[in-house]
Every structure is written in C-alpha cells, then in structure tokens.
C-alpha cells in the first residue's frame, strides 16, 4: 500500500496544494513555511491520537488571507492490497487498488461542521460519507513531534523493553531466572525486616505521633511510621532506570544528542518488534537531526528509513541530510506572496534530474540552497569573499 499524494485546500497557510510522496520522503523548507501544517493535515485523517475536539477546527485553521469557509483534505492511496485493509473496507477500493479518504470542514456563522468520506475515487459518485474515521484502527499515522518528551517516553517504554526481553527467553533461561527471582525475594524480605531497626527510621515519626495524640484520642489506635517495605520485587524491577555504563560504573546519560538517539532508536525498535500484520502505519518524524553532529544526522536519517516499517516521512532543516537523501524523494515547500506552495507538487523526476545535474558538485553548501528563497552563483572563493565583504559594507545580513 502506498500513500501517493495529498490534496489540501483552505487549510492554514495552504490555499490549494498537492503533495506527492515516495516510500521514504523528506520535507524541507524555511522556518514557518508549513512543514508541520502539512503533517498535521495528514494527522487529521490518519492519527488515532486525535480526538473529536481536534476535528472541530478553529478560525485560525482556515486559510487566513482570503475569506475562506471550507477546508478539504484528501489523501490518495494506490496499490491497496493489504488484507487488513481490503477485508475491512469492502466497496471502498477500486479494481486497480486505489482508495481515497477525505476530511471536509465547513464554517457557517461561527459554527463548524466536519465530515469524513471514503471511496474508490474522488468523484461524487464514489466518495461516500462515513460516520467516523474508524479505519484508523488498521490504517493510521504514527507521529513524533520535534518537541519530544525524552524522559517521559523512555520511562514509559522501559517496561515494554523488559516485557519483550522476558518473552524472548529460552526455556533454560526461564528456569535460571525463576531460581534467581526466589533468591532475590528472600533477600528483600530480610532487608525489609532490618531497615525498621535503624533508630532514626524507628523514631523519626515519634514527634508526629505525639502531636496527633494531642489532636484526637482516636489517633492512639494507629501509629504513623515510615513504610520500608521493599519485598515487592516486581515493583523493584519496574523501577529500574536507563543509565550509561563504562567499565562497570554507571553514569547518568548526558547530552541531548545522545538522548535523542536513544529516544528514536527505542521508538524504532518498538515499531520493528510490534506485530503490524493487522494494520498499516505511516511514520512521520519531525527534525530527527536535533542536537546531532552532521555525520550522525545522516546516519540517523538512513537508520530510520531502514528500521521503520511502512512509509516514512521526515521533516528537516539539515543540509547534511538533504545532500545524502534520494533526490526524487525530496519535497520542498516555499512561500509565494501569502500562501505556501510545493515545488513540482512534491516528489518528482524534475527535482531528481535537477539534483543529479549537480553531479560531483553536490555537497552541504549547494544543499543549503534548497532552504533559500534566492541563490547567488559565484565562480569561486574569491568572489564569495567579495560578496560577503560587500554585504557587510552595505549593512546587509545575508543570513536574515
């Protein structure tokens, strides 16, 4: 199954745009050009983490630079052959494996009505209204924001790692683990008996109990003590934390780049190990290069493309990723007057031929031109110094 393209009309900074995708696609463009808005348009149709409240668009979600009362987002799929889709969408897929999903919002006197549609094509005869986006249970989008909650996700996912490792044990390993489990349990019970014998643990709440006794005679029936119970071995195991180990010494994991790599690797491994036979998922990751050096940016982008199942869409500001990415899989967004446009309607042979035409000249410096509105071509380093000096003398900041 392939997400071929998306059509957007009247949504945020998109007046009307069509964006084509490949199996692995890279969305680039300047800041505030609309990369996140493009991904959110897809999420409105496919992200099962969104609620009914999210579908009720606000005034700011409609195209702002003209009087707009309608939003249409339409996604086109081709090569729909997956059993989990075909079996659950009877009559919605054409003989040549095409399917269309549509989300339409109409604003009338501040009242917003939204509807979902599905069909073999985008014609009025084929595109029928459906009650809800029920298909998200087996056809969905998984999204990683550029603002990642590193430790929240890592702490939430550690139990999944433990359970996966637990399920993959050999029979002889299970026997050895069970014996060790019993041994640890007995030692924890011994610790539980000894900790309350420490004088400062036993007497720490003495003043508190005296104060409670003065407040009410009923407090005499119960004493307040520190709970030192550690005998729940499962709770002890679940409370383990990730750390970096060097020569038998544990260290706190440091560096945002390192944490970012752990986050994405953990997320990718979960996706790789999960059973996706009953669903088709499109993966969207915003700015995977955060906090990483150039060579690690390239390596991480390549890793995500290989490790993640299904179609992968990345957004990036990194010329290092652009210079190594497949040319016919690059989607460039740019602004013209008050709307966001898509170069060559997304992934296309035109962009591939243009990049391939650079040949050996393709590097990080030419790749920066993809993020620019204009490019000044110079012959060599001398001319480059000349233009930089000239700009400085004229008070022009070329990076602005």
Regions picked out by a protein language model, each given a short descriptive name:
Residues 39-95:
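Conserved P-loop NTP-binding catalytic core
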Residues 68-73, 96-101, 137-141, 310, ...:
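Short glycine-/polar-rich loops that comprise or flank the Walker A/P-loop
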Residues 80-182:
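Electropositive, glycine-dotted interaction segments
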Residues 19-20, 63-69, 92-96, 107-109, ...:
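Conserved catalytic network of the ASCE P-loop NTPase/AAA+ motor domain
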Residues 1-47, 237, 241-368, 375, ...:
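Switch/communication elements of ASCE P-loop NTPase nucleotide-binding domains
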Residues 153-156, 165-285:
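Extended helical coiled-coil dimerization/tether regions that scaffold
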Residues 77-79, 145-148, 244-246, 334, ...:
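Flexible glycine-/small-residue-rich
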């Amino acid at each position: 199954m392939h997400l071929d393209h998306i059509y957007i009309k009247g949504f945020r900074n998109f007046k009307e745009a069509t964006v084509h995708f490949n199996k692995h696609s890279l969305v680039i463009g300047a800041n505030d050009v609309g990369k996140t808005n493009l991904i959110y348009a897809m999420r409105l149709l496919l992200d099962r983490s969104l609620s009914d409240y999210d579908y009720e668009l606000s005034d700011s979600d409609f195209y702002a630079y003209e009087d707009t009362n309608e939003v249409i987002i339409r996604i086109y799929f081709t090569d729909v052959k997956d059993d989990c889709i075909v079996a659950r969408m009877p009559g919605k897929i054409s003989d040549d494996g095409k399917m269309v999903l549509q989300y339409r919002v109409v604003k009338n006197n501040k009242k917003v009505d939204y509807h979902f549609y599905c069909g073999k094509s985008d014609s009025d005869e084929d595109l029928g209204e459906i009650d809800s986006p029920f298909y998200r249970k087996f056809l969905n989008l998984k999204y990683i924001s550029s603002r990642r909650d590193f430790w929240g996700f890592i702490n939430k996912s550690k139990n999944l790692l433990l359970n996966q490792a637990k399920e993959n044990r050999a029979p002889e390993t299970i026997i050895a683990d069970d014996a060790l489990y019993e041994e640890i349990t007995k030692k924890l019970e011994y610790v539980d008996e000894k900790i309350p014998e420490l004088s400062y643990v036993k007497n720490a709440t003495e003043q508190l109990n005296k104060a409670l006794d003065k407040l009410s005679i009923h407090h005499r029936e119960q004493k307040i003590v520190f709970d030192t119970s550690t005998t729940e071995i499962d709770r002890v195991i679940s409370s383990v934390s990730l750390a970096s180990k060097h020569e038998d010494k544990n260290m706190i994991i440091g560096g945002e780049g390192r944490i970012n790599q752990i986050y994405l690797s953990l997320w990718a491994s979960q996706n790789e190990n999960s059973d996706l036979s009953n669903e088709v998922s499109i993966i969207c990751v915003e700015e995977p290069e955060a906090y990483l050096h150039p060579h690690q940016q390239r390596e991480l982008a390549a890793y995500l493309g290989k490790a993640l199942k299904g179609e992968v869409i990345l957004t990036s500001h990194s010329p290092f990723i652009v210079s190594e990415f497949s040319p016919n899989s690059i989607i460039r967004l740019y602004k013209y007057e008050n709307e966001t446009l898509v170069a060559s309607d997304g992934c296309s042979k035109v962009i591939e031929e243009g990049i391939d035409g650079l040949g050996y000249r393709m590097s990080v410096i030419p790749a920066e031109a993809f993020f620019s509105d204009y490019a000044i071509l110079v012959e060599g380093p001398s001319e480059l110094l000349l233009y930089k000096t000239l700009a400085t003398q004229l008070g022009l900041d070329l990076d602005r």
